[in-house]
């Protein structure tokens, strides 16, 4: 199929996302979204087959959407679909391609320089440092020796992470007794072969100071470099080496002055990166509970169903507002949340699943909107080291952030995953906690 076969494509998506297509199905007419994806990913993920059920899909075309160094010639060689009005990244690895296509076609977008910064945590650290945005001490890591030296200089603790991955993949919190050589090997080999093309830019790594404090994210709609909508999400993470999220709550219950500080910090980051149009998902640690320090920032919509929580709390559709903005129009924006919403991820013992019970009971609890369990009998529950490995989640609402969070936690506690061979130290389903 060629682009000329889908002249009615309104939206071009750089990188295939089933979740995003599902959301667009409720917003756009049939045959209005063209997906561009790496040929390798199309084949491995069977994208043509899996995307066929989405009414909004106009077609799937092979394109080098993950060749960030070649983004400009890729965009120059891609015929512009008739009627296209917006380009969006479907996945983290499509952020640069989306910006390049928007620039080539004269459409609002992130801006290619900003997209490149946001796809590289090392470049983001440089940009934040130049703008005096508070952040942890850090350095590029080329091997285990760099990590060991940094840890020794920072009190025996550090964070090791890839500079250009997603979903907490390869991120490790290291203490004084952790084996640096083994940790480096785990981070350097972490990959997503069904999501990331083999020719994509090589991995780079950084080591950072470990900061303590509550962790939040700020979701921001940006128009002409100016933030027009802010949301603050509270997050909790699992304890241990791998800081994978256990839950999110919208809106975060914070003092007004802390919210103001986050707004100011995010505005400074927008200016520092030169971001033009679209949505940003910035993560921050509140040092001493009040002072925002930058963790990282993505030039795309948030994952973990945070967009759903924002829609439930604020009303309307964050995605629809982003599309309106990317078409050069001004979206109607909510002034304040009308309720709260929360997501809580399941935890489970490690081993072969014998049974899953309690899902119906969880779904019947007042305020619970969604229960999804990703494991079943005879399946396997492994240790959670990244976001893809979590065994399920619950979404709930409430009049307040506390009420929504407590409802989600009760629902998770009602679900039991029984395994045949527990791994020593594993937690029972529904009992995991921990906060950044």
Please provide the spans of the model-predicted regions.
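Peripheral (often C-terminal) accessory segments that flank ATP-dependent C-N-forming ligase machineries
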Residues: 130, 323-436
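Short beta-strand-to-turn element immediately C-terminal to the catalytic PLP-Schiff-base lysine
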Residues: 141, 171-176, 221-223, 287
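Short, well-ordered beta-strand elements within core beta-sheets of diverse protein domains
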Residues: 172, 209, 251-254, 311, ...
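Conserved ATP-binding module of the ATP-grasp superfamily
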Residues: 134-136, 157-160, 177-212, 243, ...
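Active-site "cap" helix and flanking loop/linker of ATP-utilizing ligase/carboxylase catalytic domains
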Residues: 6-7, 260-283, 288, 298-354
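ATP-binding N-terminal substructure of ATP-dependent carboxylate-amine bond-forming enzymes
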Residues: 1-114, 145, 330-331, 348, ...
């Amino acid at each position: 199929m060629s682009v000329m076969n889908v002249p009615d494509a309104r939206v071009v998506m750089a990188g295939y996302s089933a979740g995003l297509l599902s959301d667009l199905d409720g917003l756009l007419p049939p045959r209005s979204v063209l997906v561009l994806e790496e040929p390798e990913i199309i084949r491995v993920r069977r994208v043509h087959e899996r995307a066929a059920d989405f009414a909004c899909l106009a077609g799937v075309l092979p394109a080098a959407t993950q060749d960030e160094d070649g983004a400009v010639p890729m965009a120059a060689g891609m015929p512009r679909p008739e009627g296209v009005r917006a380009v969006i990244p479907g996945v983290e690895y499509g952020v640069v391609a989306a910006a390049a296509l928007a620039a080539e076609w004269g459409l609002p977008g992130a801006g290619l320089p900003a997209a490149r910064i946001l796809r590289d945590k090392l470049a983001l650290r440089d940009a934040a440092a130049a703008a005096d945005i508070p952040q942890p001490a850090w350095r590029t890591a080329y091997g285990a020796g760099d990590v060991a030296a940094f840890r020794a200089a920072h009190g025996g603790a550090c964070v090791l992470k890839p500079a250009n991955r997603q979903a907490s993949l390869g991120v490790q919190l290291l203490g004084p007794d952790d084996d640096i050589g083994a940790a480096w090997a785990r981070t350097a080999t972490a990959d997503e072969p069904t999501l990331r093309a083999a020719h994509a830019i090589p991995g780079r790594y950084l080591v950072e100071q470990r900061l303590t404090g509550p962790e939040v994210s700020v979701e921001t709609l940006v128009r002409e470099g100016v933030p027009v909508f802010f949301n603050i999400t509270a997050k909790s993470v699992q304890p241990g080496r791998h800081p994978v999220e256990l839950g999110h709550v919208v809106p975060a219950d914070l003092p007004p002055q802390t919210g103001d500080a986050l707004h100011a910090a995010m505005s400074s980051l927008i200016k520092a990166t030169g971001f033009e149009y679209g949505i940003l998902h910035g993560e921050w640690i509140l040092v001493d509970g009040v002072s925002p320090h930058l963790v990282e920032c993505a030039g795309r919509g948030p994952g973990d169903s945070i967009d759903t929580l924002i829609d439930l709390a604020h009303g309307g559709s964050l995605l629809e507002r982003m599309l309106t903005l990317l078409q050069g129009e001004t979206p109607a924006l909510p002034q304040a949340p009308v309720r709260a919403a929360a997501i809580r991820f399941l935890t489970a013992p490690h081993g072969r699943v014998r049974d899953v019970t309690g899902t119906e009971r969880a779904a019947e609890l007042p305020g619970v909107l969604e229960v999804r369990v990703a494991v079943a009998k005879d399946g396997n529950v492994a240790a959670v080291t990244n976001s893809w490995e979590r065994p399920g989640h619950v979404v709930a609402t409430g009049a307040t952030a506390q009420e929504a969070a407590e409802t989600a936690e009760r629902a998770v506690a009602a679900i039991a995953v029984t395994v045949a061979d527990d791994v020593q130290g594993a937690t029972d389903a529904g009992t995991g906690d921990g906060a950044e």
